[in-house]
Amino acid sequence: MKKIVSALLVAGLLAILLIVGGAHRHTVVKPVAEPEQTADGQDEDVPDDIDENLDDTDDVSRDDTDQNENDADQTEDADGMKIGVILIGDETENYSKSHIEAIVKAAETIGIAADDIEWKERIDSSDESYDAVSELLDDGCNLLIANAQVQQDALMDAAEENPDASFVVIGGDKAAVSGLTNYYNAYTDIYEARYLSGVVAGMKLAQLDKKGKISKYGYNKYNRVRVGYIATYPNAEAISGYSAFYLGMKSVMKNVTLEVYYTNTWMDMDAEATAADKMIRSGCVLIAQQADSTSVAETIEKAWKKGRHVYYIGSGEAADVAAEDAVLTSAVSDWSVYYMQLFTALSEEKDFAQDWSQGLSEGAVSITKLGKHVAPKTAEKVKKVQKKLTNGKLYVFDITKFTVGGMRIGDADASVDLTAPDSTEEPAEDDIVKSALTSYDGGTYFAESVLRSAPYFDLHIDGIKEMNLTEEE
């Protein structure tokens, strides 16, 4: 009996210690589930529609030494800010790496110590997100940043329960309608950079076509040049990006078609390499990507080394290094632009945009330095196009430049439901529906990332063929 009593006393003491020890833990409550060309590549011929009398021929690609020249002047005291970062990947893939580098750069600039940033990597499910949020709050983080929409529910729930902390979801789509003053969404206007990269691609294709450098396998049965594109999921983020890229190409090279392969994963190096290899073997002249890893670039570069000259448009700066021969340029986001603004505003306790989106004009997106095999006069052409994009003379999704099912789109086609549910939510009772069509002096365009920052251009425009990786053509 004494042994039993002693055991009960010990068990009781342990229970008390556990209760006391756990009294201050932050637990975010999860909702109950109810989802050939020559090696030099510098032929003298250029497309006939290129202006020959441009005064300014400066390189339009990004030069990091010119970015954020005023950063050094922004050294606000950021004492008291502790940042928790939840990443869908890590430094081995382009997307998360770009956020890591941008957060570190912005933090150093305004004086946030490295010890005041805590990282959670490869958080790619809702359940993992809830756990990561709870742990970061327990550790005293008062600004939580997540870089994927799959993490959105966990941060929104935490924002409701923790009004004194701030929560950011990159690519989230609920800040505009959430009613939460401490919840933020952000996304760059990367579609603008993808359009510019499409112009670069179109210039090269026009050069190759004019010189007779494309094999018969590089054309489809309608005599259109075949270009491949490797995307993640069939969502607005992917559709907006490859549609912009296609329209950029088509603005220079009319007889072009885009073949999109979905890997149906955010990052799978084997799947992405398989998609690239399949496109190369099928005869695609050029391949672009949205997918996150460098395996596409590496696969194309290997083909190049073997004499199979397939050209490449990348996504992120790491791609340029991995495909130094094949790459023409890459579309990139400079997330430090956002994080500098966010950290400064919060440290100074100033109001900040809850649904942030910036692009070429603000330096938030760009294309990288042009590759050594671009067509002649590409820099001049891109500079001219970029100027039009930034001064409102040209819009990526001008509705006169594309059709859907052979028809021009109208308001009904361009309606955006800002309360549309994702795969884990019930539909809202009162939907907030707005038209994305906007008029300007020259016509009408679909205004992407204006009604909210996250992409919503999800129209399947003519000239683009979509397939899952497992499907045969």
Roles of regions detected by a PLM:
Residues 1-53, 57-68, 75:
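Gram-positive cell-envelope targeting signals
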Residues 40-473:
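A residue-level marker of the well-folded mature domains of exported/periplasmic proteins
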